Amino acid sequence: MALSKSMHARNRYKDKPPDFAYLASKYPDFKQHIQINLNGRVSLNFKDPEAVRALTCTLLREDFGLSIDIPLERLIPTVPLRLNYIHWVEDLIGHQDSDKTTLRRGIDIGTGASCIYPLLGATLNGWYFLATEVDDMCFNYAKKNVEQNNLSDLIKVVKVPQKTLLMDALKEESEIVYDFCMCNPPFFANQLEAKGVNSRNSRRPPPSSVNTGGITEIMAEGGELEFVKRIIHDSLQLKKRLRWYSCMLGKKCSLAPLKEELRIQGVPKVTFTEFCQGRTMRWALAWSFYDDVTVPSPPSKRRKLEKPRKPITFVVLESVMKELSLKASSLGSETAEGIVVVTTWIEKILTDLKVQHKRIPCGREEVSLFLTAIENSWIHLRRKRRERVRQLREVPRAPEDVILALEERKSTPKELSSGQDVAHSPQESALCGLDVPGGEAAADGGHCLSQKLLCQEETPEATEDERDEERGGMEAMESCKGSSNGAQDGEASEKGDRLDGAAGRYLFKCLVNIKKEAGDAVVEMHWVEGQNRDLMNQLCTYVRNQILRLVAS
């Protein structure tokens, strides 16, 4: 997953990544490393050390006017990631809010062959750097890169003995107070860690770029954890010789123990951040012994990114809206048309269901409702209707001769006086659904007429809508706790819903938008929060079918 959107806000590559096609057209040295696929897309092989080096050198030349040489046998830095660190140091020392003419002094521990941090800091901000290096090859290349960019007056590269960090490097400059130190420590403790044998989760994809670092650049005794602890130990002795101490970390698991170490040592000011570039994530830790420094806030905890979910929608056709308007007029309501009448009926349905709702401000030609469902009242009604239909289906059908006899009786009605008692035959009583003495004998002689058929003749649209409603909410019904898998489950669900309501909790909250599109009304349900998104799906299906029933009735 690309993390470029999480780069530092001032990073020039955050919203405008390098244009490989443009760079290739301008720099022949870079052009020979690009690849063009059948769709014309330009890419770079980040597992090729020469290609990675060409990209770094080209970006420094194009965007910062810097010309450098880097040996393939040493670490090749990526420019966007290093730029993140520079911008964070700006935040630490308050560079953006201070007088830009004030000289800022920094230390780069282990500057590397590229000397990239001092070169960027001096070029962008005019900072003075003391850059230390233990490796002979890196030291020689770093001095050469500083000299060929005419920055020797701002960058001093010094060769130091192995395991030298801050104490020995500052012996000769005991009177100078530095504003900050930077460090990109060796990440690994041994070859196995460097190769990812015992340090990389098997579920993670392999690294997308090549590692060209030398032994002293990528490995140290105890790995980055012990390396940074040594810097902490030096800082406890130097204290206010530096306003800010900082280090970049390659492993997130190193962050917590280092923060704990600083807490144990009583360091008053501590902060951290994250550096993001492409698929690469790095962490940085900073601490200070000064009381007057401004501590940048650490990054807020980000929830795992979720794909934006589309709202649940249904369309109310223009013809249906006209019928709803006529229906409202026939019931004595004020005449309303368009999305207003749709909203009015939806609000009535929600009120009947005891779903809390209120209108909220929105744009023109649109109505918005904020819903809070306290209990699953719609599924209770659905369950009752399904149970009623099931009971009707279990009533046996009467024989055809009985039906014919009933029709003949209807065609030749008898005149009866108002005070005369009416005697029903067992068959006729069964057709009308009456309790008849000797009903068992009648049942033995034949079957009763299905009351479901009579129900269908009275309201033919109800059964069709019921089937449609069941189809629309079937998946939600199966996955929801409120679904009916029998009388016992239904009873438990109802009790649970009542408990939720009694305790002041809610099932879910959603936003309903009713807007006009091409003469029709589109109803959208947007999930906000709650127990189960399927519950919103059930409610949407119920509301839609209730609107269709209103038109059909």
From Swiss-Prot:
SUPFAM superfamilies: S-adenosyl-L-methionine-dependent methyltransferases. Keywords: Cytoplasm, Methyltransferase, Nucleus, Phosphoprotein, RNA-binding, S-adenosyl-L-methionine, Transferase. GO terms for biological process: mRNA catabolic process; mRNA destabilization; mRNA processing; negative regulation of 3'-UTR-mediated mRNA stabilization; post-transcriptional regulation of gene expression; regulation of mRNA splicing, via spliceosome; RNA methylation; S-adenosylmethionine biosynthetic process. Its main location: nucleus. The modification Phosphothreonine is found at residue 463. Its EC number is 2.1.1.348, 2.1.1.346. It catalyses: adenosine in U6 snRNA + S-adenosyl-L-methionine = N(6)-methyladenosine in U6 snRNA + S-adenosyl-L-homocysteine + H(+); an adenosine in mRNA + S-adenosyl-L-methionine = an N(6)-methyladenosine in mRNA + S-adenosyl-L-homocysteine + H(+). Residues 163-167 are annotated as: K-loop. Residues 457-496 are annotated as: Disordered. Residues 506-553 are annotated as: VCR 2. One of its GO terms (molecular function) is U6 snRNA 3'-end binding. Belongs to the methyltransferase superfamily. METTL16/RlmF family. PANTHER family: RNA N6-ADENOSINE-METHYLTRANSFERASE METTL16, SAM-DEPENDENT METHYLTRANSFERASE. This is RNA N(6)-adenosine-methyltransferase METTL16.
